[in-house]
Amino acid sequence: MIISPATRPTPMETPAIALAGTGTIIQPETSLAEFTTYRVGGKAEWYAAPRCLEDLVAVLDWFQGQDLPLTFLGAGSNLLISDQGLAGLVLSTRYLRQSKFDEEQGLITVAAGEPIAKVGWQAAKRGWQGLEWAVGIPGTVGGAVVMNAGAHNQCTAETLVEATVMRPDGGLEVLTNEQLGFSYRTSNLQKHLGDRLVVDATFKLTPGFTREEIMGCTTRNLHQRKSTQPYDKPNCGSVFRNPTPLYSARLIEELGLKGYRIGGAEVSQRHANFIVNIDNAKAQDVFNLIFHVQGEVEKHYGILLEPEVKMLGEFAR
């Protein structure tokens, strides 16, 4: 079906939209819970997951003719979507996957939908140093760039050279590390460049190590994460940024909040800076628990913890 640019369809009027010349279908009223690591959240008014750059451009061409808000979605980690869902188009990069290694220069260019953990393993198997921290991270390369993901005192910004981003009009830009404006767990893509979608990213790594050296470090990092974090329950990763030089988890644990529960959401008993979906939680349960913990820490320590998780949609306060 070809939709006239002047026509804004509604889910009640159109069951699905197949974009001519592409393999992409824009689906109405699509549950987002299965696309988030929390396994919570309502429906997207419209949802599309293109499998190549050309289809991505086609979806954005369609979007330009509609009066719709636009939300980008990667692996759905570090994210809390409300039970009411999201209006407009939710555009997922989960199927945009490709990796290209430049053996001579130690460069790796990766599509936005590739899991950052997978890229870490690929580099380690080549004996390339620089992404050992990424194993166990649940997000995509695109998400890692947007939030400057990191672990083990390392982060995306340390090895990222540049990222290709797409504007809502389908135009491409290449942003350097400096232009991305990285700081602790954020970048300009969360600020004044928030309408840009990461298409791919190029990292500069250090070749020349043995496979055993880098794989050993990578494996140790993964073991540490699995032994200290609740891998067995749905979660979004760390809930709060650390108020340097302090640690959010330590403040929360000192208040005895491990195991504190609201509805089906619980402060992890393994790591206090994680909130887990322990029993069919609603997004509102998680939201309420986040703000309860935040309030308790502020009341006792005078420190307002800043959420690392991004909240989308409407929540009751």
Curated annotation (Swiss-Prot):
Catalytic class of the enzyme: oxidoreductase
GO MF entries: FAD binding; flavin adenine dinucleotide binding; UDP-N-acetylmuramate dehydrogenase activity
Domain FAD-binding PCMH-type, chain residue ranges per copy: 39-208
Required co-factors: FAD
Subcellular location: Cytoplasm
Reaction(s) catalysed (UniProt annotation): UDP-N-acetyl-alpha-D-muramate + NADP(+) = UDP-N-acetyl-3-O-(1-carboxyvinyl)-alpha-D-glucosamine + NADPH + H(+)
Annotated GO biological process: cell division; cell wall organization; peptidoglycan biosynthetic process; regulation of cell shape
Predominant location: cytoplasm
Keywords: Cell cycle, Cell division, Cell shape, Cell wall biogenesis/degradation, Cytoplasm, FAD, Flavoprotein, NADP, Oxidoreductase, Peptidoglycan synthesis
GO cellular component terms given for this protein: cytosol
EC number: 1.3.1.98
Active site positions, chain numbering: 185, 238, 308
Disulfide pattern: none
Annotated pathway: Cell wall biogenesis; peptidoglycan biosynthesis
InterPro entries, per database record: FAD-bd_PCMH, FAD-bd_PCMH-like_sf, FAD-bd_PCMH_sub1, FAD-bd_PCMH_sub2, MurB, MurB_C, MurB_C_sf, Oxid_FAD_bind_N
Family: Belongs to the MurB family.
Function: Cell wall formation.
Protein name, entry field: UDP-N-acetylenolpyruvoylglucosamine reductase
